[in-house]
Amino acid sequence: VLATNGYLYEIKEAQTFVTNLSTTMALDKLAESKGSMVIRSAVGEINVVRKMNETNSDLGGEGNGGVILREAHLGRDSLVAATMILNCMSQTDKSLGEIYKTLPKFKFIKDKVDVKGMNLDLLNKKVTNLFKDAEKNTLDGIKFTWEDRWIHLRKSNTEPIMRIYAEAKKYKDALNLITQIKKIL
């Protein structure tokens, strides 16, 4: 989010950014405030890059801080992110803390559950019924989004687990989303 803020400060025009489904919605809120937009891809650097190519986006990345800037190369690069942040600090004459204070804030929780013996189709039906009032996305697992919070469930490609990510303005609201999921398992 800090790197994107730096990029927007430098470019000064509306942009389209690509990030995965599990990345903070602070990026969406920042983009909206600058007349820009965020497009979501499946989790994974290759998926972000593919979506960047499809949408002709110049900036993408994942929530781990790996920024992808087409101008540099189509791969995650933490040095690009650091440079973008430092450039913003230089251009605004503000400290990192001062810039950070201006950005949207959300509380993010990661959890996981064992999927051995779990009927994932039944779970998806139960979760869809539970979160009927949310926008549903099944691009990569299942994600439910509201204006101020979201929850994303996706089966791991490397372990017999389901990863659960939740985010909200308040920690207790993100935790409540995960608690609701665990109650129906």
Q: Where are each of the predicted segments found?
A:
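Phosphate-binding and adjacent anionic-ligand microenvironments
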Residues: 10-185
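Cysteine protease catalytic core and zymogen-processing segment of caspase-like enzymes
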Residues: 1-7
